[in-house]
Amino acid sequence: MKKTKILFPFLFSLLLVISGCSKDDDEVVDGTDDITGGEEPELPTPEDPEALDLSQYSSGQKVMMQTFYWDVEPRFEWWNNLSDKVEGWADAGIDRIWLPVATKGQSGGYSMGYDPSDYFDFGEYDQHGTVPTRFGTREELENLISKSHDLGLEVIADIVLNHNSGGGLEYNPYREKDTYTLFNEENGNASGMFNRNYEHFHPNDVSQSDEGDLFFSEQDVDHDVPYVQDWLWKNENSVAKYYKNEMGFDGWRFDYVKGFGTWVIEDWMNEVGGFAVGENFDGNADVLVDWVDATGVSAFDFAAFYKMEEAFDRFDDLNYLDGNTLRKVNPDKAVTFVANHDTEKDENEDNRIATENKMKAYAYILTHDGYPTIFYSDYENEAFNEEIKQLIEIHNSLAVGDVEVLHVDNDEYLMKREGNAENPGLILYISTESTTKRRNVQTNWNNVTLLDYSGNTTYTPTSDENGMVTIEAPANGYSIYSITK
């Protein structure tokens, strides 16, 4: 009996201990992590906080749309397809549209334009087996540009300056063989503008090669030749000035800029100006920074792209999001993106961001500094469309101020945009954990209820008098917090 009396209280106490341990083990929200130290605030939260009217706020910057993917369909109808979509894009907060290469390539009706043959055939000459380009006729393109301008959209031309393709065969004394370097009215240049021959490609009596990487070596355009400069950007009817003054293009996306010197971009821009971005396909941020400094124009931030791929896919480690990128060094010249026509068709999974991780990547680029680009196929994907539109609205309204990384580890990434006197800014919280996560963070907002403007969580905490608040991220997702009214 004495043993029983002693054992019963002991068992009761043990049950209490076990019960307490079970409660901790079942807790799916981690409220113990504390970025700034101190105790997690326990403040009342209103049941129905009133969201800000985001239309009353402006970040001062919008978003560009890449309007194509590789081998778009239907062929010959793409300009009309885009004309049907530009009004919706403008309403969503897009301010520029990047069109595919608009002129005739060697592959004719199948060409995506990166095998340029006739720089002035916008779909009006019968050559390479077709009158229209893959995308349609010149008239349809002009209608698209006109409609876009009426909606306040700038139109960006895709320009291939490095190489040509689709010319006729001629004897080339510099190579001592026949080469496909003859471009005239009968050979791939029906417009008769900017006829070319072997003297306009490397090697010739002006230069053996340029300072860029070699690509399409037999038809590698020699920009040192004065005739080439005249036709590409100097003459009043040059490619640059014709595209701007006759066709109405507002800016430029330069293809494969590794293939020629930075001075080519400088000379082009000195003649026609406008927004410009270069495709320098390199994940090394230092390479991108040097190129931007040399040319004075923007570059696609491939360094940021690969950091996102490493963070979300390859290494599953969000620390990579805080790595070195063009955006971190020169955000005003960084054009960020999640996918493009090249990455999406790449069979190497390390060169594309997995579909299941794309929305976290879009949340990243649409809350950070830099100029975001949306990929056509992602925006038009019904599974992504509404979410991307919401992120664009958040970007265009609240993505303001300096970027401060509040916390980063393998599974969590928290970033604050400081805002300014007229704009509260935001906090991004990305988590790849399998359960809901919470973090205690320091904000600029005192005694105010917060709301996740992405709509991914309904948790609405209130900050204390010092701006401390606990925010929440859903499992394997993100939230974007800012103040309420």
Spans of model-derived segments:
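Aromatic- and acidic-residue-enriched carbohydrate-binding clefts of CAZyme catalytic domains
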Residues: 58-63, 105-146, 179-223
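Short, solvent-exposed loop/turn and secondary-structure capping segments
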Residues: 76, 100-101, 108-112, 159-160, ...
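A short alpha/beta connector and helix-capping loop motif
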Residues: 168-192, 196, 265-279
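Alpha-helical scaffold elements lining the catalytic groove of polysaccharide deacetylases
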Residues: 224-239
